């Protein structure tokens, strides 16, 4: 089957923003105006196409990233709408990893908000080119220039308006296109019809000034155009667009557009900008792959061998396990086999589907540069590389934040007990920031995630999708443990009980590995431990790390280097080395200065000025570190870092001392060593809990 659209006509892009900036409404208008849907779905009445989960429709928020494909101006646009709530940043992270561009949506009243900063940093980490859409220009308090200024002040990047609003709030009627130097007046109807007119006289001077500012900023991306500009020659519209595109593709220029998606003003010009300025798969640098000891470039070509990255796993009620894949090179056909090079496992591609939110269109093949979902991959999880059988390389995987909050779940009946384990495993497959494990001391099943809303949604899904009824305990802080000192530690397991025995012997260097997770290094030389047992040593360490030496919390940020040991020709086996490794880690827990780590949250509190002092004092009383304050429209905004353990009940307290006029948002920042008083209390509480279990 021939390619329907050439690679240069592809746009893989996402919509990203702070919660309530209007991402999903913008996505719904894109679907409607591109002809993908014939009725506009609204988030506020639960009719959104992209927010298809029951929980999304009820709460009016996006929880899972939804993918769809639309066409606009002879281009195929693969669009992913991502969540804005901090608890679901994993969805943003894995979407940005595979996208070539993004539209950052801002609320025209609020400008850049805290979650905007978070998703912007995520996009910068993957060097994703972006354009900015200042939405809700019809909202009371909307201010385009202030929103543009907030991009400079809070994101620290070069943003250049390529449109200006005509009016604001209830008087927002259209936009000025600074490239074409024309005005578009919208009729407000759902088809977003607009009249193109000359720029009104009262806006002409401002438009000329903004046009010249735009030229000053963009000509630097093309030497020939810059020479023309400096010589006083006129720059053509095609040259202007070319310069903007070069700046965007290089991730150093961020054009700003405006409109109101809900009132159908500005979405069609936004779609034009996606086509004109965001890159195609061949405009961005080729993906990097890793073979043993070398880095290789993966050409974006149908003629190259197939290589793809699994960026999401979802459970579909009709077809079962769906694996979302970005294809970087080659062609994949349904019924073929691939190798999961991350896990070294062969997988069969039963079916390939293109997704439209939760709907599926089956296709026979998928080609380089495209995004699809695959049915039939049993062992492939988020971050895994799949490739044709002769490709022994892996793509860079993804790293995800550790869970910060946990709670116990208990099945209500024996039938629920049997279903719960399988259901939790499926949810954990879908969501890399969700963990489930059994507390060895109490026997309770613990689920852990990124926030109370995150766990609330997962418990709701357990009940609705998987029909598992559970009792839920109170939320608890997910502490972590680590080692602060370096030591060489021996683990030796010998068991002789008639017949064949057990023998495993390892010597491991344990040391701190700050912010780098668990790292295992095989330094065995001379065959002191046979190669087939090395993986068992690593597996034994990983299992033992689930139960730290201080209070039984999972261990993180440790490097383990296996450098010595021995084996027995008859008695050595995988289990013996797993046990020996766990014994070594247990001993390291005594000798390497174990420490308890607590999750630290970044909070931003907004209060009227008269409550500023009380709020500052309250944050300090919670062991908070104030990082900065600023005034915004008669309110004070306080940024601080506070331990999560001190934030339970904060919403109620804040409402109380601000008479309901204060609000805050909170997101995970990092893990930090807990003070001695906290360590003692955590150990004491854990001991009491284990006693009563």
From Swiss-Prot:
GO terms for molecular function: GTP binding; GTPase activity; translation elongation factor activity. Coiled coil: none annotated. GO terms for biological process: ribosome disassembly. It is found in: Cytoplasm. Keywords: Cytoplasm, Elongation factor, GTP-binding, Nucleotide-binding, Protein biosynthesis. The keyword Nucleotide-binding applies. Residues 8-282 form the tr-type G domain. Belongs to the TRAFAC class translation factor GTPase superfamily. Classic translation factor GTPase family. EF-G/EF-2 subfamily. Catalyzes the GTP-dependent ribosomal translocation step during translation elongation. During this step, the ribosome changes from the pre-translocational (PRE) to the post-translocational (POST) state as the newly formed A-site-bound peptidyl-tRNA and P-site-bound deacylated tRNA move to the P and E sites, respectively. Catalyzes the coordinated movement of the two tRNA molecules, the mRNA and conformational changes in the ribosome. This is Elongation factor G. It comes from Mycoplasmoides gallisepticum (strain R(low / passage 15 / clone 2)) (Mycoplasma gallisepticum).
